[in-house]
Amino acid sequence: MLTPVIDTSKEYGLVLEGGGAKGAYQIGAWKALKEAGVKINAVAGTSVGALNGALICMDELEMAQQMWSNLTYSQVMDVDDTRMEQLMEGEAPFWEAVKDAFRHMSEGGVDVTPLKDMLDKVVDEEKIRNSSIDIFIKTFSVDAMKELDIDLKQVEPGLMKDFLLASAYIFPLFKNEKLHEIGRAHV
């Protein structure tokens, strides 16, 4: 058990950045804060930080730990796990990674249906809306060409997962598509 150097009588906000693998570390930090009795009243995040922020709002630590301990590349995007591991571990030449990236982009981008499926499985819009923890995410409007700060609890019912997905988009690697419910392109 950690002895906090933080005033546990106060409430704090978390800011969670994007960057794939950082997501697992964010969940570990959340676990440590929870065990230390630190109260969180707001979360702001982008990309993986937005998804983890949703899990924090839902108070689903066990689900988050399980998700991150078993996560593979193919659970996020339509790719071959072995090939991705070779590229990430430097076991394939850099030019092959560049070639793969350009091939995916020429085909319209990598399909992120697996990420959409994951969001459908883990995100409970009602739990987030009823949470005492506020959540704000960052995305980018392609139509308006500007960053957007979104109060996730204020989005129209049924659109929460679309905004979380938009925050996680990696342009131009992921298939750029208009989020049909939103009607505008976001990345």
Segments the model singles out, each with a brief description of its role:
Residues 1-46, 54-184:
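Patatin-like phospholipase
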